[in-house]
């Protein structure tokens, strides 16, 4: 099945992200991502799906697995800011997967920079992996385990086994952190797509690292700035006070390509699988609705006078 759509590529600190600007049924997102990497751009690490508006700025952006991605969000925010007549920094609110409500992105279209505001951690917990204690920073949409030590892929698998079992989330990061050099190596696993990548950079992992270093973000002043080295470059983090309080903002430069029309060819067996899964979901939903309908208690106020009279005669109501 051949599908055509508008497409552009973003490079937020090496975390190469492809964007499909078209409505895409969620069941096809994994297939689109695989085909884009194989047929259009082998350097793409992840794909975001933008729901365009009839005119003006787009409506929202969803990642393939429904997770939250800070780098993709700030790239999407910069793209969205291009629809507004702005000069200099602008704070725009965007809707993205993995986060309830809006997310603030501070964008500078002229200088091609964007920073995403991150909510405070939902929790900080101590997790035991292979006899060692590590700090888990739980952010909305993704949880990051901070590991002060050298990169170790075997440890990543051990950690994910513990995290997936005991800490349910949409995505997990294992962040190897060199505290002296302020340098991280991020591994990210996405539950919805069952994918694990050694990321070129990770915005949420960078913020999780700062939350690991700093106990109280509210206690930091707005002069606070720090740069964390990622495999493909540095990400900047600073404190900014929004209407709902202080937040850490992470980002830097973002390269955006021109929007072009692209096509992919989705294998027929994949199409058949998606259709079968869709039909299964529809049938399960119909069954659920039927069961809910049977469980409903009849409320006389919902009946017409004629129906009420029949009920009274049939069951002897006064």
For every predicted segment, state its role.
Residues 119-135, 154-162:
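Active-site glycine-rich loop that binds ribose-phosphate moieties when present
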Residues 301-318:
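Long, low-complexity, intrinsically disordered segments
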């Amino acid at each position: 099945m051949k599908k055509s759509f508008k497409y552009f590529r973003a490079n937020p600190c090496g975390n190469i992200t492809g964007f499909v600007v078209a409505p895409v049924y969620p069941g096809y997102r994994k297939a689109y991502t695989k085909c884009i990497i194989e047929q259009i751009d082998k350097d793409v690490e992840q794909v975001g799906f933008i729901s365009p508006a009839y005119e003006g700025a787009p409506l929202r952006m969803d990642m393939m697995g429904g997770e939250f991605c800070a780098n993709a969000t700030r790239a999407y925010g910069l793209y969205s800011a291009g629809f507004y007549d702005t000069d200099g920094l602008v704070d725009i609110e965007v809707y993205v997967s993995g986060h309830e409500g809006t997310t603030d992105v501070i964008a500078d279209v002229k200088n091609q920079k964007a920073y995403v505001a991150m909510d405070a951690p939902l929790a900080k917990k101590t997790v035991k992996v292979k006899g060692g204690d590590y700090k888990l920073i739980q952010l909305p949409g993704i949880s990051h385990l901070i590991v002060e030590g050298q990169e170790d892929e075997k440890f990543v698998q051990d950690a994910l086994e513990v995290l997936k079992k005991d800490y349910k989330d949409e995505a997990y990061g294992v962040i190897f952190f060199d505290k002296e050099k302020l340098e991280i190596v991020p591994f990210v696993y996405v539950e919805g797509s069952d994918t694990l990548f050694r990321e070129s950079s990770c915005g949420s992992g960078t913020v999780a690292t700062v939350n690991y270093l700093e106990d109280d973000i509210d206690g930091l002043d707005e002069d606070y700035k720090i740069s964390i080295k990622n495999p493909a470059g540095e990400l900047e983090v600073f404190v900014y006070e929004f209407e709902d309080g202080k937040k850490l903002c992470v980002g830097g430069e973002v390269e955006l390509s021109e929007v072009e029309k692209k096509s992919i060819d989705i294998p027929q067996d994949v199409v058949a699988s998606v259709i079968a899964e869709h039909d299964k979901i529809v049938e399960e939903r119909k069954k659920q609705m039927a069961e809910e309908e049977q469980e409903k208690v009849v409320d006389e106020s919902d009946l017409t006078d004629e129906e009420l009279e029949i009920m009274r005669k049939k069951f002897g109501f006064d």
